[in-house]
């Protein structure tokens, strides 16, 4: 495994650890999710280019489209929650409230 793959895997792992450890604010969770998607995109692109997978060359673009949709939905939820509750704390979001 080359150093590029190690660095990208480390970036994904650090983003995942950040998502698991710092989930008090919704904005930090969204940033960690974006870091995970970026590292997955780079890993897929490098793997497809190095192994000459011509049939899978659209997969990184599709992943990027899903990442953009996820970011748009996350930011719209962040705006809605901050307008409703005044903060972006995840602890305030109790799904059992009616």
UniProtKB/Swiss-Prot annotation:
It is an enzyme of class 7 (translocase). One of its GO terms (cellular component) is mitochondrial inner membrane. It is a multi-pass membrane protein. Gene3D superfamilies: 1.10.287.3510. It is found in: Mitochondrion inner membrane. The keyword Transferase does not apply. It catalyses: a ubiquinone + NADH + 5 H(+)(in) = a ubiquinol + NAD(+) + 4 H(+)(out). Core subunit of respiratory chain NADH dehydrogenase (Complex I) which is composed of 45 different subunits. Core subunit of the mitochondrial membrane respiratory chain NADH dehydrogenase (Complex I) which catalyzes electron transfer from NADH through the respiratory chain, using ubiquinone as an electron acceptor. Part of the enzyme membrane arm which is embedded in the lipid bilayer and involved in proton translocation. This is NADH-ubiquinone oxidoreductase chain 4L.
């Amino acid at each position: 495994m080359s150093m590029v793959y190690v660095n990208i895997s480390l970036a994904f792992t650090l983003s995942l650890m950040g998502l698991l450890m710092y989930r008090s604010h919704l904005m930090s969770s969204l940033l960690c999710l974006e870091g995970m998607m970026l590292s997955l995109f780079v890993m897929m692109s490098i793997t497809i280019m190095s192994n000459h997978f011509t049939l899978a060359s659209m997969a990184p673009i599709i992943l990027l489209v899903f990442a953009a949709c996820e970011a748009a939905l996350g930011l719209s939820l962040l705006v809605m929650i901050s307008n409703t509750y005044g903060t972006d704390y995840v602890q305030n979001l109790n799904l059992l409230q009616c």
